[in-house]
Amino acid sequence: MKKSIFSKKLLFSFGSLVALAAIPLITISCGQTNTDQSQQPGSGSGSGSGTSNGSGSTPTPEQGNNQGGSTPTPEQGNNQGGSTPTPEQGNNQGGSTPTPEQGNNQGGSTPTPEQGNNQGGSTPTPEQGNNQGGSTPTPEQGNNQGGSTPTPEQGNNQGGSTPTPEQGNSQVSK
């Protein structure tokens, strides 16, 4: 009889000790959770204007996305390279700085104004078409896609030969 009363008291006191020890642990864990939540300033906040700034630079108003390390000037397009393009240009994806009113500059050369796209390593003259090869065609020609330099007033030269003036398309090497 005495053993059962003693065992009941022992179980009760052990249970109360466990409960008392669990209360501070629960309080500490809740306090840490609240502390972690309170130590997050600025979460969910953002500055106005709606433009994305993907680097450490601060773009000026009315710009597009700035993904490089440079600060573009206003009213430009996307600046994805390390250079600073001038206003009113298109996309500058290379390491060169194109002049105003040009198209896209995707190569390492600097085309002159009022040209088309320059995708090669050469600098075409004004009022030409697209220059996709390594040669420099003369003005008022068509597209030059080969390695030869056609004479003026010709059509497209897609082969390795140089046709004479007033011919049509030369597609085979003669």
From Swiss-Prot:
Comp. bias (Gly residues): 43-53
Record keyword Coiled coil present: no
UniProt keyword annotations, A-Z: Cell membrane, Lipoprotein, Membrane, Palmitate, Repeat, Signal
Principal cellular location given in the protein's record: membrane
Residues of the signal peptide: 1-29
Miscellaneous section: The numbers of repeats can vary and is one of the basis of the antigenic diversity.
Record's protein name: Variant surface antigen F
Species annotation: Mesomycoplasma hyorhinis (Mycoplasma hyorhinis)
Organism placement in taxonomy: Bacteria, Bacillati, Mycoplasmatota, Mycoplasmoidales, Metamycoplasmataceae
